[in-house]
Amino acid sequence: MLKVGDKLPEFKLTATVDMDINKAFTEITHVSYPGKWLILFFWPKDFTFVCPTEIVAFNELNGKFKESNAVLLGGSTDNEFVHRAWRQYNKDLNDLSFPMLSDIKRELCSDLGIL
């Protein structure tokens, strides 16, 4: 399990970043945010009933993270299309200000010791 300050494993994942279908997805890697701290959090699956509460709470803290030179990244093993559909379905997730990573191969989750 990684601790604060440990080197993040290399990764390249598709992320859902916008509700506009023309700007909805982008690729994010371990070097996408040079000079920034990365805060990663994961949830078990999209469309679960408790997870939106925690996701919204992280979103509400995102301004504080940015003030601290940190970038917030959330994710699960669902694909980017499921992330977007969940955001459309659940109004509380419509305006998230951080990328939702899609780790469908479970590589980053495994490297981080989450799975």
What are these regions (language model features)?
Residues 1-115:
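Chalcogenol-based redox active-site neighborhoods
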